């Protein structure tokens, strides 16, 4: 028997006979086939396109001559020949209220609005029933009165307004809105008045008037009080207790302003105030005229209730912070103090003046002030 020849087997590759994904067996080229794109390049290599290479950029349009109506091609050339500092047409015209200034320009800030006290100082303004009625009853000249329609025919004002108008005072009938503008929203109660500046007394005339009114007159002397509210409160208290007048130095002390008049609530129309250049010289003049000078200080001095206060006297009141100056203390005959039992070291100037005035007039003949209502009247009010 003839033996068949043995078949020879080639060794099998480790990865198998099938090609992996993406691998293809080389195809036989047929007649007429064109080479595929990049068949002649090694696998994984791609030639860089020349379109991404740097090439000389063409000239910009700005180098070309422009035609009428063409706009600049970029932002920088837009302001190339423009003068930014040159004022534009219309910048010199006044602006309307509330209109914003143009961008990049600054204007001086508007002055801050005045508060009610500054407005009063600028106009010598009085407002409210007590202050205006006292001014109408007094000797001071009123330049102008602003009053609402319902108050003008009020029985309290009708005759007085007519008299003031006959004396040359301008009377304007306004509404509350206008009064709010004039007084800067203060509590005007429907009336305001512009008064002439206060006319100070001469010291000699004040002394003569005080002596003619009392055998033991009391004058208030102010030292270093710059707060107009304190000064107005002292004037009101002194006039209410029966003092004959006040002496003010020209410097380092608040003057008689509209704020002082408002706080005094009409007391200045019946309370003379003298103004002196030199306070020390004025104290010596008072001494020569028979007045004893008492200065109020804090410390271990004679207690207020232990001093004899029944003679003609001048009571010197200093500020809460500074007190009486050393020079003023040297010209005082006596230094008195208000005894305090608490932790507070001192009192407000107007409070100290009120306590001192009460003790002065208590020693002179009254034990307590007269009340405007009796106990029976108060009982009827409480029952209602």
Swiss-Prot record:
Positions bound to S-adenosyl-L-methionine: 318, 338, 347
Pfam families named in the record: SpoU_methylase (PF00588), SpoU_sub_bind (PF08032)
Keyword Lipoprotein among UniProt keywords: no
Molecular function per GO: RNA binding; RNA methyltransferase activity
Location of the region described as Disordered in the Swiss-Prot/TrEMBL record: 1-116
Keyword annotations: Methyltransferase, Transferase
GO biological process terms on file: methylation; RNA processing
GO CC annotations, alphabetized: cytosol
Biased composition (Basic and acidic residues): 14-70, 78-95
Enzyme Commission numbers on file: 2.1.1.-
Listed InterPro entries: Alpha/beta_knot_MTases (IPR029028), Ribosomal_eL30-like_sf (IPR029064), rRNA_MeTrfase_TrmH (IPR004441), SpoU_MeTrfase (IPR001537), SpoU_subst-bd (IPR013123), tRNA_m1G_MTases_N (IPR029026)
Family to which this protein belongs: Belongs to the class IV-like SAM-binding methyltransferase superfamily. RNA methyltransferase TrmH family.
UniProt-listed NCBIfam families: rRNA_methyl_3
Protein's name in the database: Uncharacterized tRNA/rRNA methyltransferase slr0955
């Amino acid at each position: 028997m003839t033996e068949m020849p043995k078949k020879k087997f080639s060794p099998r590759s480790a990865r198998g006979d099938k090609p992996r994904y993406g691998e293809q067996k080389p195809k036989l080229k047929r007649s007429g086939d064109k080479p595929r794109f990049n068949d002649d390049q090694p696998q994984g290599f791609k030639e860089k396109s020349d379109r991404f290479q740097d090439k000389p950029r063409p000239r910009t349009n700005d180098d070309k001559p422009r035609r009428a109506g063409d706009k600049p091609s970029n932002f920088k050339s837009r302001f190339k020949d423009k003068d930014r500092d040159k004022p534009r047409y219309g910048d010199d015209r006044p602006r309307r209220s509330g209109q914003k200034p143009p961008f990049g320009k600054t204007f001086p800030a508007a002055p801050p609005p005045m508060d009610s006290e500054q407005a009063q100082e600028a106009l010598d303004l009085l407002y409210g029933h007590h202050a205006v009625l006292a001014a109408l009853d007094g000797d001071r000249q009123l330049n102008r009165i602003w009053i609402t329609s319902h108050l003008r025919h009020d029985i309290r004002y009708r005759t007085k307004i007519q008299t003031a108008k006959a004396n040359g005072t301008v009377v304007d009938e306004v509404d509350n809105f206008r009064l709010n503008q004039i007084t800067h929203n203060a509590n005007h109660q429907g009336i305001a008045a512009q008064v002439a500046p206060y006319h100070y007394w001469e010291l000699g005339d004040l002394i003569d008037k005080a002596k003619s009114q009392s055998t033991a007159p009391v004058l208030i002397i102010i030292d270093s009080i710059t707060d107009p509210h304190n000064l107005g409160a002292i004037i009101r208290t002194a006039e209410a207790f029966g003092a004959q007048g006040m002496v003010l130095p020209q410097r380092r002390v608040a003057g008689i302003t509209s704020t002082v008049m408002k706080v005094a609530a009409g007391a200045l129309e019946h309370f003379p105030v003298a103004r002196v250049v030199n306070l020390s010289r004025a104290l010596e003049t008072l001494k020569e005229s028979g007045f004893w000078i008492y200065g109020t200080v804090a410390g271990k001095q004679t207690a207020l209730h232990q001093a004899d206060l029944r003679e003609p006297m001048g009571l010197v009141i200093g500020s809460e912070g500074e007190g009486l100056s050393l020079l003023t203390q040297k010209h005082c005959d006596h230094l008195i103090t208000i005894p305090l039992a608490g932790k507070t070291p001192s009192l407000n100037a107007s409070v100290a003046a009120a306590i001192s005035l009460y003790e002065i007039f208590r020693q002179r003949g009254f034990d307590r002030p007269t009340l405007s209502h009796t106990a029976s009247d108060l009982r009827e009010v409480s029952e209602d």
